[in-house]
UniProtKB/Swiss-Prot annotation:
NCBIfam families linked to this entry: hutG
Organism of provenance: Salmonella paratyphi B (strain ATCC BAA-1250 / SPB7)
Recorded metabolic or biological pathway in which this protein acts: Amino-acid degradation; L-histidine degradation into L-glutamate; L-glutamate from N-formimidoyl-L-glutamate (hydrolase route): step 1/1
Catalytic activity: N-formimidoyl-L-glutamate + H2O = formamide + L-glutamate
Taxonomic lineage: Bacteria, Pseudomonadati, Pseudomonadota, Gammaproteobacteria, Enterobacterales
Originating gene: hutG
Protein name (record): Formimidoylglutamase
Pfam families, sorted: Arginase
Gene Ontology annotations of biological process type: L-histidine catabolic process to glutamate and formamide; L-histidine catabolic process to glutamate and formate; putrescine biosynthetic process from arginine, via agmatine
Binding-site residues, Mn(2+) 1: H130, D155, D159, D241
Gene Ontology molecular function, alphabetical: agmatinase activity; formimidoylglutamase activity; manganese ion binding
SUPFAM superfamilies linked to this entry: Arginase/deacetylase (SSF52768)
Cofactor names: Mn(2+)
Cofactor, free-text remark: Binds 2 manganese ions per subunit.
Keywords in alphabetical order: Histidine metabolism, Hydrolase, Manganese, Metal-binding
Length: 313
């Protein structure tokens, strides 16, 4: 059974510069850490949650270790300077998934996300493998049942695989099937896709599903496509698979990208999403601390989370 645990206070440590000025603060000094999972107490805040699960990665024949991602990313975030927006972060702990009950863990995450959103929070989830996206996305769909929800994925992979059980490669097929079951439109855009890492069958599935696809080669000039997608939906769920980044920026994932989309381009793509007023949920997935020897990759991933919270409107 998936268990909830509060985040350890030892994760939120850093350099104390407060002697210099009242606003010389870092995230470890402004993040609120909750000892209970009680989103109803934190309206208008951002729920920072971990999904400590890599069962989907294992099922997808990937490199396990992403279950350690949430706490590694917290440690990297802790010492970053606190600016406007970061005071809204409330750490609502980790959902720790037992092996091999991925489906049960996804349902628990789905319910937790829906509860947060219905309480007036927004959700920033730290994975975990990309199996995180089905639980997170389903919770968003549940919370906004009467509105159109757009799913924006920055990823080298389409993750529309067809298998007999859930994996880290199936979340968007699962979300498409959920939309079908609910008789609602499936609005999905994937930026940073590597043609070399996706079979023709996956491209055919994306075309059949009317997915907006932007290849890694074209992300430098994709702001118009991003704006067009934002305009056509009411609410947005943003998910960033860190393997969208090039291997030299992000080696600490299950499947590092030989080409990838540089961090600066990823940031420019997500800025209008964060500032749109439509973003309700975001996550960072696939970070694997086992392959981050000096913590540099954690800082790259944390910068994305830092920027999302800062820009979020």
């Amino acid at each position: 059974m998936t268990q909830w645990y509060p985040a350890s206070p030892a994760l939120w440590q850093g350099r104390d510069d407060s002697i210099e000025a009242p606003d010389a603060r870092r995230l470890f000094q402004t993040v609120t850490r909750s000892e209970t999972f009680s989103p109803e107490n934190w309206q208008q805040k951002i729920a920072l949650m971990g999904f400590a699960c890599d069962e989907g990665v294992k099922r997808n024949a990937g490199r396990p270790g992403a279950a350690g991602g949430p706490d590694a990313l917290r440690k990297a975030l802790a010492n970053m300077a606190s600016h406007q927006g970061h005071e809204r972060l409330v750490d609502l702990g980790n959902w720790v998934a037992p092996t091999p009950d991925l489906e049960g863990a996804q349902q628990v995450l789905r319910d937790a996300v829906s509860r947060c959103l219905r309480a007036g929070m927004r959700t920033l989830v730290l994975g975990g493998g990309h199996e995180t996206a089905f639980g997170h996305g389903a919770g968003v769909l549940d919370a906004f049942a009467q509105e159109s929800v757009g799913i924006i994925n920055l990823d080298a992979h389409l993750d529309l695989r067809q298998t007999d059980r859930a994996t880290s490669g199936t979340p968007f097929r699962q979300l498409a099937q959920l939309c079908d079951a609910q008789s609602r439109a499936f609005h999905y855009a994937c930026f940073g896709v590597s043609r070399a890492a996706n079979t023709q069958a996956l491209w055919r599935e994306a075309q059949w599903r009317n997915v907006t696809v932007v290849e890694d080669l074209d992300c430098h000039d994709a702001l118009a496509q991003m704006a067009q997608f934002i305009d056509k939906v009411d609410k947005i769920y943003l998910t960033i698979d860190l393997d969208v980044l090039p291997v030299w920026e992000m080696p600490a994932v299950s499947a590092p990208a030989a080409l990838g989309v540089p961090l600066i381009q990823v940031l420019r793509l997500i800025e209008p999403v964060c500032r749109s007023g439509k973003l309700q949920a975001a996550d960072l997935v696939e970070f694997n601390p086992r392959f981050d020897e000096d913590g540099a990759a954690a800082r790259v991933a944390a910068r994305l989370g830092w920027q999302i919270a800062h820009w979020w409107r």
